[in-house]
Regions:
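Ferredoxin-type iron-sulfur electron-transfer modules and their immediate structural context
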Residues: 1-156, 161, 169-389, 393-417
Length: 417
């Protein structure tokens, strides 16, 4: 028997009813060590870094309802940023001081062009956002010291995918940046609101990734590889939301495999797409002339090439040599321009598939999957194939133990084809 279920459906799950306690993030204590991120079994701690103005602009645009005051706040944001930078740097140097929300709202509430209602709306969203700058020198203080205004804000969002296992709190230890609290309706609403805000933000910019290079990860320093988890496409390489046990020891390994593969292979796919696009342009420009030249210099190779194109690409290949010849005769002579156009269509489709295809609804349109996974008799086969929540956003197959290696190799062959 063969069963099929949709990929990555776990991303839409809620584990609110499955946990009694949820980690609460205290940004003033966070050092951006990333230990909680890599240990979480449920991809429930998405994290990123941004410019302060990017965060404030997003908050104003989406949470302040009065249009005129929204515009006034937009115009005031550069001044707000400039007004609090020195205090932020001083606080970060001594690793204590006011929260970002307190600093921002202290300036905003003095603005006569902003009503109490609009200020409260901005304050309401900033209150629940995880905005860290005090003890994250790689994101804020080191950059700010080199160039005023360059320091960013680090955020760890607690997702509703969390099962409340507490592994992140254990890893955080005495830092107390993550502490387990009772999961009330009010707190659950806060973490959902915060993660919805996160979806409005752009991805982490390269300048906040340190010695990790997002475009050429192979050139990154090994110690900086933890930062690849700050890039959304890498962190979301496994979606979770499945029925694995709370505190599962297998899923952090799966997440590491999937995220590192995504980090390495996605730029490779995009570079391949760019090469194909360049070849496509050259073929459109010179292809017909080159074919004419080939026909003059080597008629046999010219005929073989056109026959291969008509056979493999244009669908004229039959079950036998005789059948193929009949199809060719019925179709008629294929012009050089038709043969070149057929190859161009293949290159165009391949370039699109490698760079712009949206393989799953609701996910980035950045190309087809860079990996597949075969499971055979184990925990992964159970929580991965239990509807409705599948954690795998790539081709995933579950089979009996004796078939797993063979079928997985077949999946691998499909990537090579």
């Amino acid at each position: 028997a063969v069963g099929v279920m949709a990929s990555a459906t776990g991303a839409t799950a809620s584990k609110y009813g499955a946990r009694r306690e949820t980690p609460k993030y205290f940004p003033e204590n966070c050092t951006q060590c990333m230990e909680c991120i890599t240990s979480c079994p449920d991809t429930a701690l998405p994290n990123m870094a941004h410019d302060l103005q990017t965060i404030l602009q997003t908050a104003v645009d989406n949470y302040v309802t009065d249009e005129s005051e929204r515009e006034a706040l937009r115009n005031a944001l550069p001044d707000v940023d400039a007004a609090i930078r020195e205090t932020m740097a001083t606080n970060a140097k001594k690793k204590e001081g006011e929260s970002l929300r307190e600093l921002v709202m202290g300036i905003v509430r003095q603005d006569e062009n902003v009503s109490q209602e609009s200020a409260d709306q901005l304050d309401g969203i900033l209150e629940i956002l995880p905005l860290s700058y005090l003890k994250v020198p790689a994101i804020f203080f080191s950059l700010e010291r080199k160039e005023k205004g360059a320091g960013g804000i680090f955020s760890i969002f607690v997702s509703d995918l969390c099962k409340g296992c507490g592994l992140c709190v254990e890893e955080c230890g005495d830092h107390n940046a993550l502490v387990m609290v009772e999961d009330t309706e009010e707190y659950n609403a806060e973490i959902i609101s915060a993660t919805e805000f996160m979806k409005l933000l752009p991805d982490t910019d390269q300048r906040f990734l340190g010695k990790y290079n997002n475009e050429t990860p192979e050139d990154s320093r090994p110690a900086a590889w933890r930062n690849h988890m700050m890039v959304n496409r890498n962190y979301d390489a496994l979606t979770s939301g499945d029925g694995a046990c709370a505190g599962c020891g297998e899923k952090p390994v799966l997440h590491s495999i999937a995220s590192v593969t995504e980090a390495y292979m996605r730029p490779v796919y995009h570079k391949k797409a760019d090469r194909l696009t360049q070849k496509l342009a050259l073929l459109k420009q010179d292809g017909v002339n080159l074919l004419e030249k080939l026909a003059e210099e080597d008629p046999k190779s010219y005929g073989t090439w056109k026959r291969i194109v008509s056979h493999v690409v244009m669908g004229l290949g039959g079950d036998s040599t005789e059948d193929t010849q009949i199809r060719h005769d019925e179709h008629g002579e294929i012009s050089d321009s038709e043969a070149i156009e057929a190859i161009c269509l293949v290159l165009e489709r391949e370039a699109f598939n490698h760079k712009n295809l949206q393989s799953l609804d609701g996910r980035l349109a950045n190309g087809m999957s860079v990996m597949a996974m075969g499971a055979h008799t184990g925990c992964n086969t159970v929580y991965g194939s239990t509807p409705p929540n599948n954690p795998h956003p790539y081709p995933w197959l579950n089979s009996l133990f004796q078939d797993g290696a063979t079928i997985s190799w077949m999946m691998g062959e499909s990537f090579m084809a």
